Each structure stands twice: as structure tokens, then as C-alpha cells.
Amino acid sequence: EKTMAKTLFDTKIDIVDLEFPNKGVGYFGEENKKVTVKNTIPGQTVIADVKKKRKNFEGRLRSIEKKAEYEIEPACKNFGLCGGCTYQNISYEQELEFKKNVVLKLLDNAGLTNYEYCGIKPSPSITAYRNKMEFSFGDDGLDGNLCLGMRKRESNYEVVTADCCNIVNEDICKALSTVLEYFRGTDEQFYHRMRHTGSLRHLLVRRGHFTGEMIINLVTTSELKTDLKPLVDNLLALELDGKIVGISHIVNDGVADVVKADEMNILYGQDFIMDKCLGLNFKISTFSFFQTNSSGAEVLYSTVKEFAGTSNDKVIFDLYCGTGTITQLLSENAKKVIGIEIVEEAVEAAKINTELNGIKN
């Protein structure tokens, strides 16, 4: 065991299994010790640096020596470098098979046996499906170019520009490129979490999957000096499939790397979009919770309604109901539906959505 006090560099590992959340499992050494390596899949042979953490061994992926036979060419040019996606190098059917096995293994390990496995209902959309994205400002290396996108894999600081992201509508990519181009022409720097310098933090974009309505939220510190009026004009001049209905500037002077608002100023339009789910209308504000895969959410909620059944004398409680999406969708299944939520803003949004949909019970 003393030999594992330090890292075993460049260890060759055959990946044979998967563990939750995206950890490949292999074995190494004469004693055939188990090791997990993030972002690997069964069938790959990888080179990793292995280190003991508590009672387990973890490997940091260095390179993939041999691909799995079933791997495909990723649709996104940034896959492998960008930390946003995990399984673009396999088919969606293979991804679902992996996830099925992982879930069943978790249930087995927990000793749960008295259940009926009903299979997986796939998402109707597997590209351009996300209705919300939080992008980070940063650089592509030490003192590198200003970037706006997702964190690099295995990095807490470096950023990959997501100007052609495969999981969002092209409208969102156009907005990102416009914002990045604008600030590259200024003296503004990204907010450095360790030095606490710079002003540019995040770009939060929401786009209604069924309506095409879009709100764009720029998040900076209060140190921002650049006039934002030209940026607003540039965004509104974009040729989009949908329509920008709101642009806001959010001020966040906190040290944590999260999107929150100390102050919010609407620069154009409004701070919400409207979208639909199973025929109902929903007002979705900047910080509202709403399932990020809209078409997948319809499959999910239809299944919930099916499992709940219909009864004229039934009272349904929706715990942790958020903005009341499921609560309202279940209203036609019961005499009365009661949503329970601790976040006051979400409760107020739920009340507004209930009025929009004319729901009385």
C-alpha cells in the first residue's frame, strides 16, 4: 500500500464496466486492483495516472490508446475538450443501455428487489434540446484569449468557447458569439476566481423550445465599465429562428462561481419567456426552475400522469413543486392538487402560471 502514497503515472488500463456517474471501471497491477477513470467507457484501453483516495483507486485520464468498437464520430468538434457532454462518441441507443445498467446496478447495490423495471423512454430530441444554458467567461489557457462557453474537462478554470454547441438551438450560439466578439473588442477581462479581478462572469440564456422566445442575461461584477447599449443593438440585429424578448444585466459581486443576482437591470424587453408543456402555458423567468429538455419533459410528465391515474375524489400533493409544472399538469387527474414549495419566488410564479392556464383546483 505504501507504493500508492504517490501517483502511478502512465498506467495502462482496460475499461470493462461503468459506475455512476460517468466513471469507467478497470483493473491494474499484479493484484488486479479496481480503479475508476472518469470519462471512459467499456471497451476502451486508456492511459491514466492512478492515485489512491481513501480506500479506492482513481485514475486521471491521460489518453485513449484504443477506442471501443462501438464508438462513433462525435457531432461536436469540441467533444473531449469541452466538459459539457459525456457520451457524444456513442449512439443514443448505446447511451441508454449504459444508463439502464447503471441504474439497475444502483438499485441492486441498495438491496432493492421489489420493483418492476419498465424500460427507458427516450427523449424525442437528442440535439438542440436544451432550453437553458449557463456559459462561463474565461480563457483557453494561462493568460490566453478571452473565451465564453463551458469549462474544459478536468479543469475548474479554463474555458472552451461553445460557439457551435450541439445541444442547443443555433439562436443561442449566435447570441454567445455576438457577446464574445463584443467584449473581445473592449478592455474587460473575465472574473478570475482566485485573484478576484476582472468583471465578466457568465452568460445565461433561456429559449422557449416551442415558442422560440429568448432572454439573454449578462452576469458581471459591479466593476464593469463598458457601455452595453451597442451590445444590445448587436443582439437585436441578429437573424434568428426565434425572437429575443428580453436582455438583462445581472450584477454579482459574490466570490462563489454561481449565477446569482445582487442587482438586475433590464436593458431591453422583459425578464421572462413563455413556453408550453403538454398544452399548458408557462411563464419562465431568469431563475425559475424548468426542465431543461422540453420535449423530454413532456415524455416524463406524461408518464407521471399515467402512473398517477385519474380519480374525481383524489387529492394529490406535489412536494418540492417549484413553479408548479407537475402540479398543474396533474390538475385534470384529481379533485384537488396541492403544491408544497419553500422558495417564495417559485410559489408566486406557480400562481401566475395557474392563472394563465385557468386552473381552479
Describe each model-derived feature in a short phrase.
Residues 24-29, 149-153, 217-219, 350:
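Short, acidic/hydrophobic/Gly-rich beta-strand patch recurrent on exposed beta strands
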Residues 157-201, 222-248, 255:
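Internal alpha/beta scaffold segment
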